[in-house]
């Protein structure tokens, strides 16, 4: 799984959007720090970056009428089986949140979606 370029979030089909939510939940919880080739860069940033990215996913879900468990809106929450952060420090974020989400990464994501038979407008 990958984190989709944030410019694509509003265009993601339902399965990819909901899958991204599940991926963010896993990474925020016990998956934090577990190596995976396509998301290793996430662990070079503060967990606050992942929370902020996940917020974008959850906001898109809400705009489409999906209900998100409210506990995930708490920056300190890490899932039912993972201890919460005491007080995860907020940080000033860039745009995009992850500097790795550049033009080349955008094209990789579009190509990945195309390989799945998904053409974006």
What kind of region is each of these model predictions?
Residues 1-121:
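Expand to "…catalyze enediolate/carbanion chemistry for C-C bond making/breaking, isomerization
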